[in-house]
From Swiss-Prot:
Its main location: cytoplasm. This is Ankyrin repeat domain-containing protein 34B. The keyword Cytoplasm applies. Gene3D superfamilies: Ankyrin repeat-containing domain (1.25.40.20). Phosphorylated. Keywords: ANK repeat, Cytoplasm, Nucleus, Phosphoprotein, Repeat. PROSITE patterns: ANK_REP_REGION, ANK_REPEAT. SUPFAM superfamilies: Ankyrin repeat. The modification Phosphothreonine is found at T269. Pfam families: Ank_2, Ank_4. Induction: Up-regulated in bone marrow upon differentiation (at protein level).
Amino acid sequence: MDEGSEVSTDGNSLIKAVHQSRLRLTRLLLEGGAYINESNDRGETPLMIACKTKHVDQQSVGRAKMVKYLLENSADPNIQDKSGKSALMHACLERAGPEVVSLLLKSGADLSLQDHSGYSALVYAINAEDRDTLKVLLSACQAKGKEVIIITTAKSPSGRHTTQHHLNMPPADMDGSHPPATPSEIDIKTASLPLSYSSETDLTLFGFKDKELCGGSDNTWDPDSPPRKPVIATNGPKLSQAPAWIKSTPSLKHQARVASLQEELQDITPEEEIAYKTNALALSKRFITRHQSIDVKDTAHLLRAFDQVNSRKMSYDEINYHSLFPEGSQTSVEIPTDRDPDSNQIFASTLKSIVQKRNSGANHYSSDSQLAEGVTPPTVEDGKAAKKKIFAPSPSLLSGSKELVEPAPPGPLSRRNHAVLERRGSGAFPLDHSLAQSRPGFLPPLNVNPHPPITDIGVNNKICGLLSCGQKALMPTAPIFPKEFKTKKMLLRRQSLQTEQIKQLVNF
C-alpha cells in the first residue's frame, strides 16, 4: 500500500503540501496564514507528517530540509497524536535518519515521552534497528545526565524484538541466573503418608513452579548451572523430622492421654482404691444422729449445759462398735495411707477428738454416784480385753460405714435375719456383760447372754466390697445373731437425765 494513502489530509492543504514535500507550496500556505500545528482526524500535525513521509518526485525536497523549515516556523515537536506518539517517535519508527532526530532534539523534543502503549522514542529506535539514530538518542540522554538501560526480552509476532527501557536504574544481572521466586510462584504440596510408604519415594512438601510459568523459555536443565528449584524431600521412616503441625493430631493426643491414665491406675492397689471410695462417701455427707434421750424441765439450765453435754457424744457409738468385736475375734486392721494430705489431717483430727470425748465421758460417769452403784469392779480378764479393744480398728474409720448403712430402709434381708431394732436414744443394741462391767458409768443390760455372739468378720469385708464396687445393696443395721434370738426383740433404755443431774453437770 502506498504511504500517501495512509496519510489523511481531510482537505487540509498544508498537511497535503507537507506530505508531498512541496517546500514552496508550504511556504506560501504559511505566509498566507495557515496554522502550522493544525492536525488531521488522527491528531497528526504537519511536523509529524514531514517526519514520516516517503514521497519522492522531481519537485519534492528531503525530510531534513522540510523538518528544519517547520521547526524554524515555531512547530511544536512535543505534540502527541491520538495514539500518544510524538514527532520524535514517528521519526524513529519510520527510520527518518539521525539528521532529522538531531533537529528535533535541538528544538526541544522530549526523550521521556511515552505513547499509550508505554513505548518511548528509544524503544522505537531499537525496534527499528537503526544504530545511527540510537547513538544520537543515547548521546542526548548522556548530555542531560540520564543513564539508559536497555533489556531485550522477546520478539513480537512480526519478528521484531520487543524491548523495554528503564531510566535512572542500575544495570540488571545479565549472567542468565534465575530471578528470586515471589510468593505467588511457590507451590506448596501436602500429602498424607500411607502405611506402606517406601523409603525410596520422596514426599515433596515445598516446590517452585516451572521456569516457563515464571516467564522463562528454556526447559532444559544444565548440570553446571546453579539449582533453580529447591526441593525439600522427606522419606517415609523420617516422619519424626516433619513439622509439628503434621505430627500432632487430636487422635494421637487422646491415645497418649489414655495410656498415661492406665499407667496411673495400675499403680493403685485394691486397698487404696477402697480407702479412696470410703473416704469420699464418708466426707460427702453429714450424718445427724440422736445420741441421748433427756427429760428436760428447765430449758435455761439445758442451754447453759449444752456445751459440756456435747463432750459426751461419740462415746455411745464407740461402745456399740466395740461390742461388734469380742475378745475371740480381735483382728488388726491396717489403715491404708491416703495420698491426699488433707484427708490425712482430717483423719488425725478425728482420732484426737474421739479420745478426748471418750475420756471426758468416762470421767463424768465415774463421778456420778447414782450411776456407779450397780457397777461391779472389773476383773483382770476384762481389763485385758479392754486393752485389746483399744487396739481394735478405729471407730472413725468404720463408724462411717455403719452410719452409711443406717439410713437404708429395712429390706427382706434384715427381716430374714431378724435384726434387732436399733434406736439411738434408747439403745436396743446387745452389750456383752463383761464389756458392761469393764465400762464404768453404763447400766448393765436386762437380759444378759452368757454366750455373746461372735460377729463374723466377713461382714466388714462384705461392706467394703460393696462400697468399692459402688453397688447399691440392702444391708442389715446390726450383725447377724444366732437362732435363739429370733423371737426376742430387746428394747433397752440406757438412762435419763433429770434437771438436778444437769445442774451437777454444769457445776462439774
